[in-house]
């Protein structure tokens, strides 16, 4: 009887293990579910084909309307809208007016239209592009003018190099002039000549008063000579 009881107790843990295995298997299934969700997200959906409008672009329609209206002060948005509706009524969308306003603003920002007091004109053709190309050609001529300047700059150092020997020649002349400075006794001889020159005018000055005195002396001897002759005549009479 003890052996039968032991045999009856053995299958009990096997049932528990089976129950644990049954519990573990459903827990693994939710882990696979997110992978399937990722696979669904990665698959791209079919793209909707773009509907090509039957009417021309808004830039073409607006420019055509302004050119056809030919208004001096420009065409208003209402006049432009009426012209486009009359020509392309069957192909325009229901929100045509709103799209037209936004497209006109974009054309003004791009410089294709000019706004004048609530009306719009076609922008003038860029005629200023040609003068810009002419100005670009002028700077190309400047490097040519710089090339001769470099030649002259190269020649000027050669001239300076040639001028340096000339500067040395005056230095030699100064070296020759130094012996003249040594001959200072000649400079001492000059004062003697000056002293002699001073003596000459000093001697000339006494001659002037001597020249004045002789006339007075001459006048006196003439008077004395006359009475001397008279006694001589008396002797002749005797």
UniProtKB/Swiss-Prot annotation:
Cellular component per GO?
Answer: nucleosome; nucleus
Concerning PROSITE patterns, the annotation shows: H15
Task: Supply the Pfam families for this chain.
Answer: Linker_histone
Compositionally biased, Low complexity: which spans?
A: 21-34, 123-132, 198-208, 217-230
What keywords tag this UniProt record? Chromosome, DNA-binding, Nucleus
Positions of disulphide bridges: none
Q: Which GO terms describe its biological process?
A: chromosome condensation; negative regulation of DNA recombination; nucleosome assembly
Query: SMART domains, from UniProt?
Result: H15
Region entry Disordered, spans:
21-57, 123-238
| Protein purpose | Histones H1 are necessary for the condensation of nucleosome chains into higher-order structures.
Q: What is this protein called?
A: Histone H1
Q: Which organism is it from?
A: Triticum aestivum
